Regions:
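Post-transcriptional modification and biogenesis factors for structured RNAs
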Residues: 1-156
Length: 156
């Protein structure tokens, strides 16, 4: 079982998910997709963004957040990425098993999910206060590589 899990709740844009899959392969993470999906897993744009790596990604698809949440305790400590997070993602010391949760491109994670997990909601600081958010696949890469950087520093 992977030590790092990347979860995308209701992704809308196939090429972001394809890029996220490539990032997961690069960092040794398992990709989880929580329905509804805004595309088919057979989408040509998804495959194009994932290049010839996509067949190796093997994302786990969950019918709902509730279904995924049942499996969550077995996967590791979860951190919810949102522009509304009060704490920077770099201020977290990620444990040996971690789950990074991201929302859909247009609106992010549902407010009720962020409220329920406010103590584990983190943000990626941005210098431009008028910028609402980063691209989803960019955010996933930033978060995933920070976890791997910390783990490497600790010899994990």
């Amino acid at each position: 079982m992977a030590a790092l899990h990347i979860v995308v709740v209701a992704p809308e844009i196939p090429w972001n998910t394809g890029n996220a899959g490539r990032t997961c392969l690069a960092v040794g993470a398992q990709l989880h997709l929580v329905e509804p999906l805004g595309f088919s897993l057979d989408d040509r744009y998804l495959r194009r963004a994932g290049l010839d790596y996509w067949p190796r990604v093997r994302p786990e698809v969950w019918p709902s957040w509730a279904a995924f949440a049942e499996a969550l305790p077995d996967l590791g400590a979860a951190y919810f990425f949102s522009s509304r997070g009060a704490r920077s993602f770099t201020d977290v010391s990620y444990p040996e098993r971690a789950v990074l949760v991201f929302g859909r491109e247009s609106v992010g994670l549902p407010p009720e999910l962020l409220d329920r997990h406010a103590d584990r909601t983190v943000s990626i600081p941005m210098r431009d206060p008028e910028l609402r958010s980063l691209n989803l696949s960019t955010s996933i890469a930033i978060g995933a590589f920070e976890v791997r950087r910390q783990w490497a520093t600790r010899g994990l």
